[in-house]
Amino acid sequence: MAQPAHVPKFGNWDGENISYTTYFETVHRDKGDGSKIFNPNDPEENPQAFYPRTVAQDHQHSEKHHNDTSTDYHVVKQHRRKHHRREDREFHRYVEAPRPHRSPFQGVDMDSHRSRNHGTSATMSSSVKRNSDNWLPQHQHHRRTNKDLAEGKSWLFTTTTASSYTKSRKLSRECSSTTQSSISAKNLVPGDETRSPISWRVFQSYLTKLKEQKQIAATKIGQHLNLR
């Protein structure tokens, strides 16, 4: 079996010769106090290990970009100067050019044209106003006519409804009187038909008359419903 590693006591570390304690003591021997430890796995401390381009190439690229930008700026500036100079020359040429002479007859023609236009506009406004004045009474008359027609229709509907209601009540009263007569006729039936043949004939004729009255009332109701 392998022997376990010898672990020194806490107080005997300086006296005994232990390999790992010696290694830890000599790690920072070459570095002075306060120096920063270099970490090769940090991209900020070791950018060349993580990016393909070197620092020198980045510096050259930035200088080239600056030179190209300055060159473009000068080209654009020269182009704008040429453009402004051309505009200034055209403006001076326009100011110094002679003005065309206008005869007094042209002014008279313009004044007459303006007066004709003013007269035409005044005539159109007066005609529009006259047409609007004529349209207003016609519109009011049309509104009154529509109102009268509406009132006439409502009166006719009310009258027709009232007459229909009166006829219905009259027919219902006739039917109720006929029913009451039939009820009173039942009270006239004798107890023995063989003992009073005369009264039975009278009762039979009375029943026939009641049937006729019922038929007449039913006919009137049917005619009234058909008329509605």
Curated annotation (Swiss-Prot):
Basic and acidic residues composition bias: residue spans: 56-75
Cysteines joined through disulfide linkages: none
Disordered as annotated region, ranges: 56-87, 99-133
Annotated Polar residues bias: 118-133
Compositional bias ranges of the Basic residues kind: 76-86
Signal peptide: none
Domain of life: Eukaryota
Family per similarity comment: Belongs to the RIN4 family.
Name by which UniProt lists this protein: NOI-like protein
Originating organism: Elaeis oleifera
